[in-house]
Amino acid sequence: MILLPQEIIRNKRDGKTLSRQEIDFFIKGITDNSVTEGQIAAFAMAVYFQDMNMDERVLLVSAMRDSGQVINWQSLNLNGPVVDKHSTGGVGDVTSLILGPMVAACGGYVPMISGRGLGHTGGTLDKLDAISGYKTTPDSLDHFRKIVKEVGVAIIGQTGDLAPADKRFYATRDITATVESIPLITASILSKKLAAGIDALVMDVKAGSGAFMPTFEQSEALANSIVGVANGAGCKTSALITNMDQVLASSAGNAVEVREAVRFLKGEVVNPRLHEVTMALCAEMLLLSGLAADIKEAQAKLQKVLDNGKAAEVFAKMVGALGGPADFIENQDNYLQKSAIVRPVYAQHSGIVQSMDTRALGMAVVNLGGGRHSASDSIDYAVGLSGILSLGESADSEKPLAMIHAQSEKQFSEAQRAIQSAIICGTDSLQAQTQVYRHIRLPDIS
């Protein structure tokens, strides 16, 4: 059977179901450059409009995963499961820095391959880059495997060896208005995650004003797709749909979020929302990977490693193993950049925080220099927001909406206006919000 890229595009354009051979051929062509940019764009648009069924999505993810190296952990004789978490992104979402060490301290191995900031959402790699000396690109995949075995967790960026088809595919989607396709989002996320050779995966799919997906229904559709496809590709996976109607942590930025993560791990300052979401994700990871028999046991194990300092110790070891300071956990302020200006922003009218345009707050951080408008932009790790009020908290002349970390008066003034517009105060008392909306497991997928 002779396969041609244009015929595969035609079949999908016309709403036909693609075969394994067609999908494998097309993804191989993306990897070896025998498929052109125009053909990738046409294929992406055909999928965008005609969708893919669950079988096609599984085949697409598997082909993209296998386009490069798939990490093998069996030769290391690990004495625990290999498990990971992925978030669709939000503002103040510092869970990865806390969750990885917690799960590792409970006996799991967490090879986390993370990304950089995208639009208004922060990136885990950018946060880690704020730590002096930390290398998000290890010397080799063998070095990465060695750190995971010895420490229990390592957080790095994608290497060229893992799912190379995704890099080219995504670059084309980014400039052809096909990023939003759920089958293609599913394939992009899972190809990289499954190439890490994990046994289990927990997805954190955000919903709300700061989420990647604009509606709850779309967040739910993405969660269902990822759970169904990942399990179909042989990786035990479940998802939590979590609240992104306000900033998750008390801070948003890079150094400011790292500082909050360290203080959380040390038990110094614990934001209740961040604690609830992190504990829920960690517990799901322990349950899915067999490290706990039930939710009560999982929560007890997790709280224990926070209380006895073991999770903080694992974080310190990871930072040291990847080139950061050996005493970072004790002396983080010596190694994290500070901005020239740290000053409060107050509400224009006193009241109770009613709502938050979380996306606008994320963009305020980007405009301070803490994120990128284009991929080539450099980041100022010192800037951001801290002490951000929660929904239902009172703001007045004594209690600011947030602290702005800026490098100039102009930056401060622009951020001040953005924050005052994004956080709405009124007179109504608010009930505490649910942070975890739904758990989605394989039996839930119709």
From Swiss-Prot:
Its EC number is 2.4.2.4. One of its GO terms (molecular function) is 1,4-alpha-oligoglucan phosphorylase activity. GO terms for biological process: pyrimidine nucleobase metabolic process; thymidine metabolic process. GO terms for cellular component: cytosol. InterPro entries: Glycosyl_Trfase_fam3 (IPR000312), Glycosyl_Trfase_fam3_N_dom (IPR017459), Glycosyl_Trfase_fam3_N_dom_sf (IPR036320), Nuc_phospho_transferase (IPR035902), PYNP-like_C_sf (IPR036566), PYNP_C (IPR013102), Pyrmidine_PPas_bac/euk (IPR018090), Pyrmidine_PPase_CS (IPR017872). It catalyses: thymidine + phosphate = 2-deoxy-alpha-D-ribose 1-phosphate + thymine. Keywords: Glycosyltransferase, Transferase. It comes from the Bacteria. The enzymes which catalyze the reversible phosphorolysis of pyrimidine nucleosides are involved in the degradation of these compounds and in their utilization as carbon and energy sources, or in the rescue of pyrimidine bases for nucleotide synthesis. Homodimer. This is Thymidine phosphorylase.
